[in-house]
From Swiss-Prot:
NAD(+) binds at G90, V91, G92, N93, L94, G95. GO terms for cellular component: cytoplasm. Modulates transcription in response to changes in cellular NADH/NAD(+) redox state. Belongs to the transcriptional regulatory Rex family. Homodimer. This is Redox-sensing transcriptional repressor Rex. GO terms for biological process: negative regulation of DNA-templated transcription; response to redox state. Its main location: cytoplasm.
Amino acid sequence: MDQQKIPQATAKRLPLYYRFIQNLSLSGKQRVSSAELSEAVKVDSATIRRDFSYFGALGKKGYGYNVNYLLSFFRETLDQDDITRVALIGVGNLGTAFLHYNFTKNNNTKIEMAFDVSEEKVGTEIGGIPVYHLDELEERLSTDIQVAILTVPATVAQSVADRLAETNVHGILNFTPARLNVSENIRIHHIDLAVELQTLVYFLKNYPQ
């Protein structure tokens, strides 16, 4: 099936399914029901079945889903055998945490380099990742770097995004409050932690469990 027709909400849930199925496989489990998946990932069973239906017959009624088959399917669908190389721009507290973490649970995603303007950080390694001066951004970003993580001050986020647009980067994970304007060939995911926290507090107050 043409993955362009898969709803974005479904696409966002695929890595969640994949991680749980990975854990099932490691535990030696051979099959799983949509109800078990629902309980584990906190997505209702009907939504899971609908998500899976976009990819054809992944399971059998009365049997559930074969764990190894799902693992193989999602690995291919999510391109888990291809390495995604990432650059991080902004080595403050959040950026430093990313460098130490470096997606240890995702073997196909690696931060290769970082950029900052601090004299104390430029020329060092954090979590084994070299930190370069921001002035070297275009020079250092190779054609292999496809994704950038932005953890810079909001005041400079747009100017950095403009520079990234001149490189081979096609995806930006933006952790700044700034809403960025870039060309259509670059996809941006905005993650504003303050907004997420405010949303959580609102739901706690207005939708008590």
